[in-house]
């Protein structure tokens, strides 16, 4: 090289598989070779990886890396033009993202008309060009990383430490297509195509290979606080011990590949070996809470009994106290009986509960306390007093886990009774108490209460402020971010507001959290399912609404307490009335008026009184509930805004809604109106006097009168 060969001749020194001998080349030699610019000597290195070579420190070096062979967005557009295909920039970016710019795969996409390529073709190409050429040990490492879109150096070290050291893994990865190393962030990014292929290979691998990958992935997620992802990974291989080893907090109603958390809890109950369950009693109690929250009452009871046997064997008073906190739901919503469990827990526990912490939503994420605990007519106020006492005890055991709940119940009760000033005070008390202790469900409940209260008073400015508060991401609790429960609680508030203010465009959107189906009804979604019913009614699907509501009345009363029943009966009254069945409408309205009479629960009926008004004239209703009907009519409350869809319920003259008289009844009524006695009518119509008397009773009831002198005017 130093002999300075003649100008007309050149020396090419090619060193292949440089990665094998790189350690034998001192850096000074490489620097010397790179300084031969302008000579006839050309040195070419070929390697599957230059990962450890500081090329940027070498002078006069030209190099081509694997990234140079990948097509950029602009390259893909030019490639497509050569094939006579016109691509938009957006299409090119999509193809680049999907293929990583690997030319062979870009070509497949373009040949397929820029549509998604059949997975069989992609898989075969990956198999031929990439997978078959890799060593088994590298395949094993890649399958462990298949769950991640990006992996940093520490993740590679942890997940592959038994396969090779970090340096060796780095050299392997550097040589792989579709795996990009971000030196600045020190992480690897798996192209979507590579990740999809690896997941496909993993899905079709042996169970031992799957276990190796998913178990290690689950352990990584668990140790880094990503519990939901950890549970999903462990469940892939039915690793029940792995699931129970996680801190199963804040997972209520989450989905794992379309499987609910409750279903996973049920599987653990049925299939997890007892020796595994015995190692994780706290996790069993958390699963009990999840089962009850999702209305799986039978499974809750079974697992609760198993957990008690395990805990009693351990002789841990604090753990037994935790069991009592969970066991209290056996007697839900009986506050007095629940209180007995809390008292026993108080005697056992020497530290705050480790189950009912900030991250575990209070009372299943239900945002209404009176929908849970108002269960007996005539006991609205007494329940408020009991709840206040019980919550004080519960909060002492859980470091304030239920803060604001008692105030929320009182505020809801006041709002329902039309005591709007008191309701606002309690609403703010509940809001600030819950914010202090991060009790999310009470926070949302207080927002709903304050907004509803503002609507009832006609203060739309105040109502819109609550809506702004709800929509501001800054007010979302960090531990609830991206959870299904947060979506459900927000949409419960939004959908209730949409029912009260149907003209508000901000609330006209598709709801994600619940459907009209009843088979998956639970404490959290029952409210949102309920307030969807008016949407069905507004579309005039009265028979469908009646079917749903009638079935709902037969559901376990733990899920459908008095406030829910009030809502259901009100809607049933409107629906039956709309299809011309006034008698059935009156039966359901009587429930509403009876509750209003006993506990002064007037606001809901008063808000819809414009549409209920015709029903107030029904004879069976007007005579029995005249006083409470007058209270509903006179309550100072804003009426629901008129919308075209509600025109079916627009009030008309009262006699238009009376039950029609039969031909015989009208005949007898007209004769009686002319002053004929019962005997004279009987003789004229050739019927008995008793028959005349019975027909007149029916006429009086239908026309809502109590004397014969009123007949002429009513008939007219």
Language-model regions, residue ranges each:
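Alpha-helical sensor/transducer elements of the RecA-like P-loop NTPase core
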Residues: 12, 28-94, 104-109, 194
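Conserved P-loop NTPase "ATPase switch" module shared by AAA+ and STAND
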Residues: 4-26
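Extended alpha-helical scaffolding segments used for macromolecular assembly and cargo binding
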Residues: 208-283, 290, 299
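Linker/hinge segments immediately adjacent to helix-turn-helix/homeobox DNA-binding domains
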Residues: 112-123, 531-539, 543-565, 569-663, ...
